[in-house]
């Protein structure tokens, strides 16, 4: 029998997911009860989530976040940051942050900020933020600052979120 080979996309996901997990403590690996129910059925409870295995956790994040988010189409040096953004925010918000970061790299905005990851986004990211990942980190921190302005009760998470954003990738 031929030796089984690991899917290159899955291998790339594992590398980026490991970077995210190393950067921040997430007991359930970013898996939410909603994600668990979508994959395993509506009868899943918080207790099931608390007892999630590392393999199940990885499979869910790969199938529910990595693949539908088309994260592998983005420049390699921003994939871990973008994966983490998708775990913290809704996917559309993560894409908006990415789009604003791309636009911040030049005087003329080059992409629409609409939360839709179109084909041109990866190319635009390659020409801009892949050259300076700090643009994406800064845009993420700006998002958190604006969130605190809108919702002062979020202030308690500021240091944790800011540290998370700047220390990854």
What are these regions (language model features)?
Residues 1-169:
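Cell-wall polysaccharide-cleaving catalytic domain and substrate-binding groove, primarily
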């Amino acid at each position: 029998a031929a030796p089984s080979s690991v899917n290159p996309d899955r291998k790339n996901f594992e590398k980026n997911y490991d970077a995210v997990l190393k950067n921040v403590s997430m007991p359930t690996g970013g898996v939410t009860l909603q994600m668990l129910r979508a994959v395993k059925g509506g009868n899943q409870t918080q207790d099931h989530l608390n007892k999630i295995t590392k393999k199940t956790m990885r499979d869910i994040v790969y199938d529910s976040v990595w693949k539908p988010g088309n994260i592998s189409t983005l420049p390699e040096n921003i994939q871990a940051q973008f994966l983490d953004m998708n775990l913290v925010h809704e996917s559309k918000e993560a894409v908006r942050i990415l789009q604003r970061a791309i636009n911040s790299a030049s005087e003329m905005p080059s992409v629409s900020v609409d939360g839709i990851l179109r084909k041109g986004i990866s190319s635009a990211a390659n020409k801009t933020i892949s050259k300076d990942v700090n643009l994406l980190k800064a845009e993420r921190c700006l998002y958190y600052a604006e969130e605190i302005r809108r919702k002062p009760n979020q202030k308690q998470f500021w240091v944790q979120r800011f540290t998370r954003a700047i220390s990854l990738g």
